[in-house]
Design a protein with these regions (language model features):
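Terminal amphipathic alpha-helical/low-complexity segments used for targeting or macromolecular assembly
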Residues: 1-84
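Structural signal for interior beta-strand "rungs" in well-ordered beta-sheet cores
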Residues: 82-183
Length: 183
């Protein structure tokens, strides 16, 4: 969770490393931005998300100016969410999150918490089963493949890979690969 401006910068830097790579110069970034690649779009989305989280956690309590900045950041982030057909709640995903293919859209992430260095592909749905409290808790280094889903009050451990088109409705231990309907 972002609690300071330094945290926000760190989160943005880690998201940039995961989505754009480590050796991206300004010229390469501008070329990718002009061409409209998926990695630049994902980086723009996460940069807007991290700035919204900072505004929500730190600036919102600091009077009218903080609330105005929060409203602007929220509007900017929701505009990008609608454009890319991605729904990720604030303060849910850790740093270093990766979206390799954002254009296909249909990504919904509504979990209690998701660890660091996770990734999701097109068509991933992570959410509650019946009530708002029944949402998954996800560890670090978890990869969701194309079309995979996770529902209910479950815990997915660290270093887990979820195969394409799998539906996870039970707890998953650390260091495992899960596939099937239901998994």
């Amino acid at each position: 969770m972002i609690q300071s401006k330094e945290d926000m910068r760190f989160y943005i830097q880690e998201d940039k490393k995961r989505n754009l790579g480590t050796n991206v110069s300004s010229i390469k970034y501008i070329a990718k931005w002009l061409y409209g690649t998926d990695d630049v779009k994902a980086y723009r989305l996460f940069k807007a998300l991290r700035k919204l989280e900072y505004a929500k956690n730190c600036l919102y309590k600091k009077g009218l100016w903080g609330k105005a900045i929060f409203a602007f950041r929220k509007l900017r982030y929701h505009r990008l969410e609608e454009r890319y057909d991605v729904a990720i709640g604030t303060n849910m995903v850790g740093y270093g999150f990766r979206l390799p293919h954002i254009v296909g859209g249909g990504i919904i992430i509504n979990c209690n918490s998701m660890g660091n260095y996770c990734g999701a592909n097109v068509g991933v749905v992570i959410g509650n089963n019946h009530t708002w409290d029944e949402r998954p808790t996800i560890g670090d280094h978890v990869g969701f493949s194309i079309g995979s889903k996770a529902y209910g009050n479950i815990h997915i451990g660290s270093h887990v890979t979820i195969a394409p088109n799998s539906v996870v409705i039970k707890d998953v231990p650390d260091n495992s690969v899960v596939s099937g309907v239901p998994a």
